[in-house]
Amino acid sequence: MSVVYKKKKRNVVVGVVYIHATYNNIIVTVTDQQGHSLICTSAGACSFKGSKKATPYAAQETASHAVKTVVEQNGMKTVSIKVSGPGAGREAAIRAVQACNLNVTSIKDTTKLPHNGCKLPGRRRV
């Protein structure tokens, strides 16, 4: 007979929502203050496929799904938001987190910008 281990539910009141928006997808990760991941989801995991993953609607649905799951399981009440990437769903994901009745303490843009680093790839020739 096999033994099934159930993950212990932790009561996490304060957390961090990381939103990584690229041109092709959006990834939302919710962690506690120490950085331990509570849930990680993407637009592809929320049944958006192909070019629909890069839309603001997909970002909104992905962010709201992640936050609602954490609120139900862990009782989170306060979050800070960290956004990175140049994608189209940045603002929609932030609004979706704010609409989930959470106290948002800060919104920070952590997009990395090169100070003239590597050479960009050449333009596509079709």
Curated annotation (Swiss-Prot):
It comes from the Bacteria. The gene is rpsK. GO terms for molecular function: rRNA binding; structural constituent of ribosome. It comes from Ehrlichia canis (strain Jake). Keywords: Ribonucleoprotein, Ribosomal protein, RNA-binding, rRNA-binding. This is Small ribosomal subunit protein uS11. GO terms for biological process: translation. Located on the platform of the 30S subunit, it bridges several disparate RNA helices of the 16S rRNA. Forms part of the Shine-Dalgarno cleft in the 70S ribosome. GO terms for cellular component: ribonucleoprotein complex; ribosome. PANTHER family: 40S RIBOSOMAL PROTEIN S14/30S RIBOSOMAL PROTEIN S11. Belongs to the universal ribosomal protein uS11 family. Part of the 30S ribosomal subunit. Interacts with proteins S7 and S18. Binds to IF-3. Gene3D superfamilies: Ribosomal protein S11. InterPro entries: Ribosomal_uS11, Ribosomal_uS11_bac-type, Ribosomal_uS11_sf.
